[in-house]
From Swiss-Prot:
The gene is ubiE. This is Ubiquinone/menaquinone biosynthesis C-methyltransferase UbiE. InterPro entries: SAM-dependent_MTases_sf, UbiE/COQ5_MeTrFase, UbiE/COQ5_MeTrFase_CS. One of its GO terms (biological process) is aerobic respiration. It comes from Chromobacterium violaceum (strain ATCC 12472 / DSM 30191 / JCM 1249 / CCUG 213 / NBRC 12614 / NCIMB 9131 / NCTC 9757 / MK). Belongs to the class I-like SAM-binding methyltransferase superfamily. MenG/UbiE family. The keyword Nuclease does not apply. PROSITE patterns: SAM_MT_UBIE (PS51608), UBIE_1 (PS01183), UBIE_2 (PS01184).
Length: 244
């Protein structure tokens, strides 16, 4: 019998989740950047900038951007590593990857792009100085397997940056719940003509491990040290793991 997992609040067979997540992102790819700005009031740019500026990534480094989507972090990494470095933009969703590749090319940013499953990364052991995954981990079926793969491809001393929605500060919960479950689907319907995908977004955030649970998952995956920073009252958290 097939094992089950969650897709938002629904229980589905593990073998079905990836396909259902793919449908969501095929649907929203063309409006993804517009919706990110609208939903977060532009704050997603601040969160990503914080990730980049506190990373310690420098010229010549090799960086893997997992679930990189439309390329926000990849563009930032490319600027930091310069011509002597190497940045890979990867995503499991071809629609998102196409939008990201085309957007980067339009901006004159040329870097390798790969359609890749985070649970089975097509890269050698101990290759990258840094790995990032922004707003992608919660959509993965086997998060533990994906985290182990991220650890595998990092060099000793390399860092993993997980930027993801997390458990919000308790006094903000009533407003945040109203916004997530009432406003987001309406915005999704009006802007992207897809309320269901943004209902899934709200549900997937609530089902994602909280800050301390994710920290322990990263330690269990092989990272020697893990810290996290809450951003915007815990709406988002940036976890940093170091491979020893």
């Amino acid at each position: 019998m097939d094992k089950t997992t969650h897709f938002g609040y629904k229980t589905v067979a593990e073998s079905e989740k990836a396909g259902k997540v793919a449908e969501v992102f095929h649907s929203v790819a063309s409006k993804y950047d517009v919706m990110n700005d609208l939903m977060s009031g532009g704050l997603h740019r601040v969160w990503k900038h914080f990730t980049l500026t506190t990373s310690g990534v420098r010229a010549g480094d090799k960086v893997l951007d997992i679930a990189g989507g439309t390329g926000d972090l990849s563009r930032g990494w490319a600027k930091r590593v310069g011509k002597t470095g190497e940045v890979w933009l990867t995503d499991i969703n071809s629609s998102m990857l196409t939008v990201g590749r085309d957007r980067l090319l339009d901006e004159g940013v040329i870097l390798p792009v790969s359609l890749a499953d985070a649970e089975k990364l097509p890269f050698p052991d101990n290759y990258f100085d840094a790995v990032s995954v922004a707003f992608g981990l919660r959509n993965m079926t086997h998060k533990d397997a994906a985290l182990k793969e991220m650890c595998r491809v990092l060099k000793p001393g390399g860092k993993l940056f997980v930027l993801e929605f997390s458990k919000v500060w308790k006094p903000l919960s009533p407003f945040y719940d109203f916004y997530s479950f009432k406003a987001l689907p309406i915005m999704g319907k009006l802007v992207a003509n897809d309320a269901d995908s943004y209902q899934y977004l709200a549900e997937s955030i609530r089902m994602h491990p909280d800050q301390e649970t994710l920290k322990q998952m990263m330690l269990d995956a092989g990272f020697g040290k893990v810290d996290y920073h809450n951003l915007t009252g815990g709406v988002v958290a940036l976890h940093k793991g170091v491979k020893f």
